[in-house]
Amino acid sequence: MLQGLGVWDWAALAGYFAILLGTAWWVVLQRNKSSRDYFLAGKNAGWFVIGASLFASNIGSEHLVGLAGTGARDGMAMAHYELHAWCLLVLGWIMVPFYTSSGVFTMPEFLERRYCAAARWTLSVFSLLSYILTKISVTLFAGGIVFKALFPDPIIGGLDNFWFGAVFMVVLTGLYTIAGGMRAVLYTEAIQTVVLLVGAGCVLLIGLHQVGGWQRLRDVCQGTPRMVAVTSEVEVAQSTQRTLTQIEPPAETGDIPEIAQDAEEFLDIEIEPGAEPALELDVTQPAESVVVELESAGENREQTAAAEDVSAPQKTRRWRLFLSREKLDFFNLWKPNSHPSYPWFGLLFGAPIVGLWYWCTDQYIVQRTLTARNQSQARRGTIFGAYLKMFPVFLFIVPGMVAYGIATQGDTRLFPVLTDGGANQAFPLLVKHVLPVGLKGIVIGGLLAALMSSLASVFNSCSTLFTIDIYKKLVPNASETHLVWVGRLATAFIVLLGILWIPVVIILMKGSLYDYLQSVQSYIGPPIAAVFFLGIFCKRVNAAGCMSGLAVGFILGVARLVGEILSRGNGSAAETIAMNPFLSWFTGTSFTFMAIWLFVASSAVILAVSLLTPKPPKEKTDRLTWSGRSAEERAEARAGWNKWDVIATIGLVACILSIYIYFTGNMFR
């Protein structure tokens, strides 16, 4: 574990934990006297704390690991989800006035006031289950990957560091979340935001320097052959540093010599005098790929005495690098509609539906704005958070591309990034092998900040949902002190569930981490988004329509998820699905397309049932719909912003459009 970390690294880590735990302890000493204090931080937070908390709670370990992984595998495609910063503007300018004027603690509570008690219970239970199965599980898995990549040697006995890291983060974060409540989450996240931005910025700048600068990264990741797979064979004793052994390609390879030249330039590896690139058609891979065999010294070679004498026998690892004739297109946001994960039509129309659900209606996010002292502070917090939200495009996705570029230029320490399923290791491997001693501690602190902020946010949101939406309904006469302690016990129980879920996480997370998260959210979010937005903008929508839309949307979403799992199996169910055109489409179409269909189906059911049933009573629409606002509420909302808020909003939209323009290639394919 100690290998590669210097005194200053450990000093930075120690300083980070000292400041973090000191802040948490200071918050605990402030005492949470009521449920309002514990769950909404006393409703006294300012715009900076709110914006930083929005960013830190969203940017968790799944972003550091998952976004960098998608950057190493598909380039800028996943940036669409990070450019949903504009959804925060919708939250601040449109949704917050309804939430704050209604005085609710939770999003399910808002649904009860707009529709019925059944809507509140349904959303509360479903949200709790989805948090445990998605947010907690994804964060724990990503945390385990980070610890395993940074510290491969066991810390305690023979315990795998994947397990140690996941359990350690869960317990530590759970302790200060239980003790300090929402106020502890807010103020520790403000610190973690600074650490995270500084740490990720160091990785980006030093990584770009290592790969040769921005233009070199574009050259490597745009228009060159794609490295489609890497396998590592057994280590052998060898007296060479880096050689490419010659294997004659078959005569019928056609244009293989051209690819051979591309491969040599693509890898940019020093070839020992007399040696030539080893290229052949790989019979186990598609005919459109070739193989480069590379023998290189082990990653710790530079730390051995043998490194000074290249004639001495050294342990080397033989790598087989599979190059596809497909050209890289990493700097293009728009993929063809045939792309399995990121078709441009689905990203343009389906992904925003998930973004509006997440940023405008999910308890995990909206709870931060409910802590504001007034609407003005809440709105400015969302604007500030939206600006911060654009940073991941460059701080997390681009480093993944940098890791790919460094690996394809011959740095075998980063070759795991090129392996099947190994892209998720891009960010932690950059930290481990590219950063100099002294900066690693700061960046590892940023990684830990992402882990802990994600867990703290979901723990507090879960305890709030359980205590306010479920327990308080069952025990309506519970005192404020009693509710605070129930919230703490609920958090402790969530922590325990998180630990017990770790073994299942390993099974669930086979493949791309971020794809898994976005696909599940695409099956959960659309019906909830439809219920909230139609409820606010259409007074005619009633409780019957709400419950019908939620039921249809959830059933279709679960059916898609189960069908997708069955279709990937080897049993009779997979054969049945493959033979049925509709089932094959339903289980195989991109999750971005499915988000569109789920939203359309849920909205159609909500509107149809509402029109066929009586209008909602006046108390369900007054102050809770756009046209039902009073003159006083409109005046209060108008008094909460000035020209600088408008200028900041326009500036954000301009920044987003600029990024879209810069990274747009041939879109309609």
Give the location of each predicted region.
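Membrane-embedded helix-loop-helix hairpins and adjacent transmembrane boundary segments
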Residues: M1-R669
